[in-house]
Amino acid sequence: VRAAAQRMAALIDDLLNLSRVTRTALQPKFINLSKIVEEIAQSLQESQPNRQVTFSITPDLMVEGDPRLLHIVLENLLSNAWKFTSKQEKTVIEFGQKAHAKERTFYVRDNGVGFDMAYADKLFGVFQRLHSISEFPGTGVGLATVQRIIAIHGGRIWAESAEGKGTTFYFTL
């Protein structure tokens, strides 16, 4: 009963956050995405200091955007990478940028469990999960929140993945 109540509380919190995000006015500033990623990576490593995780973070990737909202995006993407690599002996999580159709495209890449691309269109729906809750915890609201924040910034997000080979999330702003 306690576990179910905790899960319900987490779900309600996530839904409230999703609702707030869709109503939030942007407060854009020039920010260093790499610094935000470094802070989140440090926090993740402190949460499980015995995990063998290598972070590769391209330095000084500057953008104009809402710092609070982009922190939510990066925290969700990096937490997912952390979660879905938890069964790896050696984990690699990368953050960087690449040229993609004349846009600045940022990415978060991991070497985790990945997923079947046939289900990629379900990734960003509320309550959509590609793995069972017994395998990996979560509410199924995080990526929906991420997509809405990216859209508010005028960008888009998509993923490439292969089962057993990891996932890369790409986004533009």
Short names for language-model regions:
Residues 1, 142, 146:
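Short alpha-helical Gxxx[C/S/T] motif in the catalytic ATP-binding
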Residues 3-8:
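Short alpha-helical segment of the dimerization/phosphotransfer core of two-component systems
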Residues 27-42, 94-97:
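A conserved beta-strand-to-alpha-helix junction within the catalytic ATP-binding
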Residues 29, 49-62, 98:
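Conserved catalytic submotifs in the C-terminal HATPase_c
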Residues 90-102:
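Short beta-strand/loop element within the Bergerat-fold HATPase_c
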Residues 115-127:
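Short conserved segment of the HATPase_c
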Residues 154-160:
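Glycine-rich ATP-binding loops of the HATPase_c
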